[in-house]
Design a protein with these regions (language model features):
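Donor nucleotide-sugar binding/catalytic pocket of nucleotide-sugar-dependent glycosyltransferases
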Residues: 127-167, 178
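Conserved donor-binding/catalytic core segment of Leloir-type glycosyltransferases
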Residues: 178-194, 200-203, 216-218
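Nucleotide-activated donor-binding/catalytic signature segment of Leloir-type glycosyltransferases, i.e.
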Residues: 229-256
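Short acidic/histidine- and often glycine-rich active-site loop of Leloir-type glycosyltransferases
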Residues: 283, 302-316
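Short hydrophobic beta-strand element within catalytic cores of glycosyltransferases
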Residues: 296-299
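Conserved acidic donor-binding segment of nucleotide-sugar-dependent glycosyltransferases
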Residues: 311, 315-322, 331-336
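A short, well-ordered alpha-helix in the C-terminal region of glycosyltransferases
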Residues: 324, 331, 338-352
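Glycan-recognition and catalytic cores of secretory/periplasmic carbohydrate-active enzymes
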Residues: 356-358, 364, 368-744
């Protein structure tokens, strides 16, 4: 229940974005209908329900309509005092007295130190519900302290933000031909509360020392402030620009921008000026959006900025203090490194507030309130190769990434290029997209260049395509070598659909590696190599390859017999990373040799691993903060995408052979870790680029999107494409589209 676009107000846009986030994350599991709030009867309603907020009887009519709709399970009221008629909007009580569905609220304003009448009214509102959302911790504290509301019914959810691909301002400015300019910006529906005058007056002082500054004032004037076609506030601002002689330094963008264009302007901003003058403004969407686009900020002190804007992200100044705005802005303009670091800190800080993560918080609360056992499943994101391609040069896939910017100085590894070859090959097999082939050639060529005369491989190559001799000498390269064999085998297994030159190169490298493969000792290396050997043998049966598989996996059996006990059915006295490859190796050895011992150990060891990763408390990734040793308690946190991806790959192999439906359920549970079913309830991928985040820590996500994490996420996502299910048929009842309008 809310205003909704095309109505031009911040709450309308907030509601639209919240719903889009929910639909993006949960898809066909749920539908959202709108009860649109209007000030007068609407001739042609576009939403499922419409409420004339000035008609007291209409509140009862709408409540009865909703009561009679069996599909409606919950009513979520977006609450602002000005949205509803009556004293403090008390017409809403007519609806609450009549509605029989569960109700929750979002309070967009929480007024501290209320008078007795306001306090009584707010407590009365919440007597109709045991749930309310607020957007700041301070709002939660005010409700508890000033209104005597119990903490258990309050859910703190940050104002949502759009996920963007990180860029430096200089990169983003190219789109707007603003290279070389120092860009300041402010956006939103303009009005007196925005206090743009302060920004302009500060600008007149700033340009004395920084004449190359351009101040973007983005957005239309609030429609309620345009009377008889006269835009008094904008006229006032333009007159001030004239008075201060700032024509060369100010650009009014007097239009509603679509979301992506707005975000591009924010990414091109060197410093965002948040000039609001309302000391009681609980939350600001414009402030949140600016931080999420990596803008360093100079911001007025309001409750939201005081709570969120730490000194490593920007500077807080007194409301309306022109000198403080100018001084802080000049300080930041004089230090490029400081601005860049502040922008990155702001970007990292706001990722938890993405609309996808906000949707998860809402849905977790909704499921507590809905009065039946409705199953709500995650929807699978679109398969995206944007970041994979961004990480790839003509030499190969770059190892690391600084947020989403590839770090060329980190060089290249056989590990990453082998994984990339497997993943992009899977994508080609699924889609037949010939744009994948040049990338497969790049990764294959890298593997080919890494191969030594004896058939083994080096792993580390620098940005100039030179071998890292010391690193390759110091590090045990068995795992990376074995991954190379896995990748080569995966290509050869696709020989019927790939160009001959790709298959020929892969076959040449593969056969050359076989004498080395016989000598592998480490368990995981045996597993990776066995996977490649099995894939080769599945399309080109070869007694020598079969013999190597048997020889290697006999070593694994020996390991198992040494270490396995009644309560620890495993190949070693510890669980580390990529554990699923070991039972998977046993499975492939069984499929090639038909020896019962391999099947027995494959199933026993997989069951043991699943018992450690899938518990009554949910899915648990083996922590890299300290491996899980036999007889000890497992460590917490320090979770990496590679382990999640590997268990999905393992379960996929076992499901394909044994068709045990439990394996499929485990796969879905594990993949949900990427989608937000983890201890932070946050997504582990970038939905815009397909980048995979590098790790899930105790309190935060590592937002770097390196090769390993990105390819592991992609591999898991490609596997899950085979298991996509429409759980139920749902009609999308969101009928309107509008450009982004924010007035908060």
């Amino acid at each position: 229940m809310s205003t909704y676009p095309p109505t031009q107000c911040g709450i309308a846009t907030y509601t639209q974005d919240t719903i889009k986030g929910i639909m993006d994350v949960y898809g066909n599991s749920i539908s959202c209908e709108i009860c649109e709030l209007v000030k007068s009867p609407k001739e042609n309603p576009t939403q499922a329900f419409t409420l004339n907020t000035n008609d007291k009887e209409d509140y009862i009519r709408v409540a009865e309509e909703i009561n009679n709709d069996d599909l409606v399970k919950l009513v979520h009221i977006q609450h602002e005092f000005g949205l509803f008629a009556g004293n403090y909007g008390d017409y809403l009580l007519e609806f609450l007295n009549a509605i029989k569905k569960p109700v929750t609220f979002t309070f967009h304003s929480v007024i501290q130190n209320p008078n007795k009448e306001l306090k009584t009214f707010v407590k009365l509102l919440l007597s109709y519900s045991n749930s309310v959302f607020v957007m700041t911790n301070q709002s939660q504290e005010i409700l508890m302290r000033d209104y005597d509301i119990h903490q258990e019914i309050i859910t703190c959810v940050p104002h949502g933000t759009h996920v963007v691909v990180y860029e430096t301002p200089e990169q983003a400015k190219q789109k707007f031909n603003m290279e070389g300019k120092k860009v300041l910006s402010t956006f939103g529906l303009l009005g007196e509360g925005k206090n743009i005058e302060t920004g302009l007056q500060a600008l007149s002082k700033i340009v004395e020392k920084e004449p190359n500054v351009l101040y973007l004032i983005i957005g239309r004037t609030h429609p309620n402030l345009i009377l008889d076609g006269v835009d008094v506030y904008r006229d006032k601002l333009e007159a001030l620009v004239d008075e201060l002689n700032l024509h060369n330094n100010v650009c009014f963008i007097n239009q509603y921008l679509d979301t992506n264009e707005l975000l591009d302007y924010l990414k091109a901003t060197d410093i965002y000026l948040f000039t609001s003058k309302d000391p009681n403004q609980a939350v600001s969407g414009t402030f949140a959006y600016a931080m999420s686009c990596a803008c360093p900020l100079v911001a007025s002190k309001i409750p939201h900025t005081l709570e969120v804007l730490s000194s490593d992200c920007g500077v807080l100044v007194d409301i309306g203090n022109v000198d403080q705005f100018a001084e802080a802005t000049l300080k930041l303009l004089s230090d490029d490194n400081l601005r860049e670091e502040m922008g990155k800190n702001a970007f990292r800080k706001m990722r938890a507030s993405s609309w996808e993560n906000v949707a998860i918080i809402h849905m977790n609360r909704y499921t507590d309130l809905i009065e039946n056992d409705t199953i709500i499943d995650f929807d699978y994101p679109e398969i995206q190769l944007t970041h994979v391609k961004k990480l790839t040069t003509e030499l190969g896939m770059i190892q690391f990434s600084n947020i989403s910017i590839p770090d060329l100085s980190s060089g290249y590894t056989l590990d990453d290029n082998a994984r990339a070859l497997v993943a992009v090959g899977m994508h080609y097999k699924l889609t037949g997209d010939k744009n994948d082939l040049p990338y497969m050639l790049i990764y294959l060529d890298f593997i080919h260049r890494c191969q030594k005369p004896d058939g083994s491989f080096i792993n580390y190559v620098d940005e100039h395509n030179r071998e890292h001799i010391e690193q390759n000498a110091e590090v045990n390269l068995e795992d990376s070598n074995a991954r190379g064999i896995w990748a080569l085998g995966s290509v050869i297994a696709m020989k019927d659909i790939l160009p001959e030159n790709i298959v020929h190169t892969a076959s040449e490298c593969f056969l050359k590696s076989l004498p080395w493969a016989e000598t592998i000792q480490s368990p995981r290396s045996i597993g990776f190599a066995t996977k490649g050997l099995y894939l080769y043998n599945s399309v080109i049966p070869n007694l020598y390859v079969s013999a190597i598989i048997n020889k290697l996996n006999a070593k694994l059996v020996s390991n198992y017999e040494i270490h396995a006990t009644k309560d620890w059915k495993w190949f070693e006295n510890y669980l580390t990373y990529g554990n699923g490859i070991l039972p998977e190796s046993m499975l492939y050895a069984y499929l090639v040799t038909n020896k019962p011992i391999y099947k027995k150990i494959a199933l026993e060891s997989l069951d043991f691993l699943l018992s450690k990763m899938f518990t009554k408390n949910g899915f648990r990734v083996i922590s890299n903060n300290g491996w899980y040793h036999k007889g000890a308690e497992p460590k917490e946190y320090g979770e990496q995408p590679i382990d999640v991806s590997y268990i999905i790959q393992t379960l996929n192999g076992f499901y394909n052979e044994f068709k045990n439906p439990l394996y499929k359920e485990y796969m879905k549970t594990a993949f949900n870790w990427f989608l937000g079913k983890n201890h932070l309830n946050q997504i582990m991928y970038n939905p815009v680029s397909g980048g995979g985040y590098d790790g899930l820590e105790k309190d935060n996500i590592n937002l770097n999107q390196g090769a390993e994490s990105t390819v592991c996420y992609l591999t898991a996502r490609l596997i899950m494409e085979n298991f996509k299910e429409a759980e139920c048929k749902v009609i999308d009842l969101i009928k309107t589209k509008a450009d982004l309008i924010i007035n908060s």
